[in-house]
């Protein structure tokens, strides 16, 4: 009896050990890299202000109303701050953590439908995707959004392959509605366009109306509304201008116009998608062709008795990925992370058909090594040419990245290694190598974070020192200072908040008058603006400067 219990414990530990090792690799540099402008600073600061004010309904950025995105990530990060305090890792924990959870999500779904070997192949594919690894390690909304949306879509497919009328169908469908609500609270109503568009298109292609009859809309919509609606209702009641800005400006106007100034050609996402799937491009192409021509697999259950067609999960995932690509390619606003939700489902598709984790992992590890070497060397050459020197830290991170990639590549030649070990080494090599490249990038000038600038200025500040941001707003200054700034002659993404509270605006002339009267103050200037006003005789002493900001003291 005791021996049996011991064996079970060892087996349980063996099952969890790979995930523990992957997690250690995944979170290795979460605290090492400084927050980067602009997004990481923004999504670190808004939760800090929520926690400081106690207002978890109306998001504020630099103490101005900020309604571009829903609050789920703000809430989660504020909880992290309340428990552990502000730091790089607490600001990134939610987004980076849920990006990591995508690995477990894909594994669980593929294993349930297609077996353990396919599941391991899918994890290998996702774990070596350069695009997924880079975006997944940044404090953006896209990592968490990708998890919730992917979970909703995969839960929907599990409901559709369950026996009609079974408890599993209802359970998975309600889970899909709840997960979709969390996706809406992560990034907005685009969830309906992507998931709903995929459902409509799939139905038209398959001529399968049975899918619609199994949505459990009454209970599902009720659950969805219970989770998603309260915040939208409360924020609208407190801020009557919210609905027009959020639903119209941030969704319809963003898609139909170029007002957000993120104009890119229609093919913008194609090379990014190639970067995402490059290590497993050939298996994916074969899986895509197979999913379209013969999308059913023996391990997939289920059509309703007498139905002319059955639900085909892999074909649905393929349609869903295509909807994401086409929708964002047609949009007037394009940013690289928008297509991140494609990557987990494409990895699941590749894994379901290839069913050879060791082969995929070996190929990916060998292909990644030269790419990492070129990238590491390219960053060093860039620094040498632009800055006339290469920081010591850049050399260190470059060597670490190359070492991680080479170790994984060399290990791939061990033909007798178990598939799990082969996948684990390849994934850890890729995860670490791309993180180390990100670290190399951050230490090469110009500074892409205000962390060092703030550290140089902090000794000259007191809790009551007036702070100004003149001609610019650098997003990482506020979270590292733990303070908000008075904007001077600048609007940018804070224009809506300034329109809501016009008394918060300050012209450069008003600033100059107040600055001259101050006995103690610090201003963060755009370098060009500082040069102009210094020549005009504006008093001040430069405390610190980098390529983007000049910190000036009134003293």
Identify the residue ranges that each predicted region occupies.
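Membrane-integral, polyisoprenol-dependent glycosyltransferases
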Residues: 2-362
């Amino acid at each position: 009896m005791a021996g049996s219990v011991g064996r079970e414990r060892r087996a349980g530990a063996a099952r969890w050990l790979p995930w523990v090792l992957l997690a250690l690799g995944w979170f290795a540099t979460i605290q090492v890299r400084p927050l980067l402008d602009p997004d990481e600073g923004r999504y670190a600061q808004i939760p800090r202000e929520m926690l400081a004010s106690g207002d978890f309904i109306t998001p504020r950025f630099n103490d101005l109303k900020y309604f571009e995105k829903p609050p789920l990530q703000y809430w989660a990060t504020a909880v992290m701050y309340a428990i552990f305090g502000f730091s790089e890792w607490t600001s990134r924990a939610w987004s980076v953590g849920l990006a990591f959870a995508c690995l477990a999500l894909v594994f669980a779904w593929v294993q349930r439908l297609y077996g353990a070997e396919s599941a391991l192949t899918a994890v290998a594919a996702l774990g070596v995707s350069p695009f997924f690894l880079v975006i997944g390690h940044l404090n953006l909304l896209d990592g968490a959004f990708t998890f919730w949306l992917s979970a909703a879509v995969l839960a929907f497919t599990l409901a559709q392959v369950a026996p009609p009328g079974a408890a599993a169908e209802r359970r998975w469908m309600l889970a899909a509605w709840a997960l979709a609500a969390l996706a809406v609270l992560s990034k907005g109503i685009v969830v309906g366009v992507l998931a709903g568009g995929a459902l409509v298109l799939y139905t038209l292609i398959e001529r399968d109306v049975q899918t619609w009859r199994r949505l459990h809309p009454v209970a599902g919509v009720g659950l969805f509304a219970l989770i998603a609606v309260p915040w939208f209702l409360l924020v609208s009641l407190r801020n009557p201008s919210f609905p027009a800005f959020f639903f119209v400006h941030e969704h319809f106007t963003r898609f139909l116009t170029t007002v957000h100034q993120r104009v890119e050609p229609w093919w913008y996402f194609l090379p990014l998608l190639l970067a995402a799937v490059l290590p497993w491009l050939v298996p994916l192409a074969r899986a895509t062709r197979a999913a379209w021509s013969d999308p059913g697999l023996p391990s997939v259950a289920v059509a309703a008795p007498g139905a002319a067609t059955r639900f085909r999960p892999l074909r649905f995932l393929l349609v869903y990925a295509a909807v994401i690509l086409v929708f964002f390619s047609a949009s007037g606003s394009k940013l690289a992370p928008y297509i991140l939700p494609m990557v987990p489902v494409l990895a699941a598709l590749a894994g379901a058909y290839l069913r050879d984790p060791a082969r995929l992992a070996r190929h990916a590890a060998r292909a990644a090594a030269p790419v990492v070497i070129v990238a590491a060397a390219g960053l060093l050459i860039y620094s040498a040419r632009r800055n006339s020197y290469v920081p010591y830290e850049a050399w260190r991170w470059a060597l670490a990245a190359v070492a991680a990639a080479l170790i994984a590549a060399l290990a791939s030649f061990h033909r007798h290694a178990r598939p799990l070990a082969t996948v684990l080494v390849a994934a850890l090599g890729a995860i670490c190598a791309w993180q180390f490249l990100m670290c190399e990038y951050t230490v090469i000038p110009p500074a892409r974070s205000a962390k060092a600038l703030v550290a140089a200025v902090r000794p000259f500040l007191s809790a009551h020192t007036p702070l100004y941001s003149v001609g610019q707003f650098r997003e990482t200054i506020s979270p590292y200072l733990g303070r908000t700034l008075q904007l001077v002659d600048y609007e940018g993404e804070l224009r809506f908040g300034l329109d809501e509270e016009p008394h918060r605006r300050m012209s450069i002339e008003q600033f100059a008058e107040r600055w001259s009267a101050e006995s103690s103050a610090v201003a963060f200037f755009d370098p060009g603006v500082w040069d102009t006003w210094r020549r005009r005789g504006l008093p001040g002493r430069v405390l610190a400067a980098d390529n983007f900001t000049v910190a000036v003291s009134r003293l």
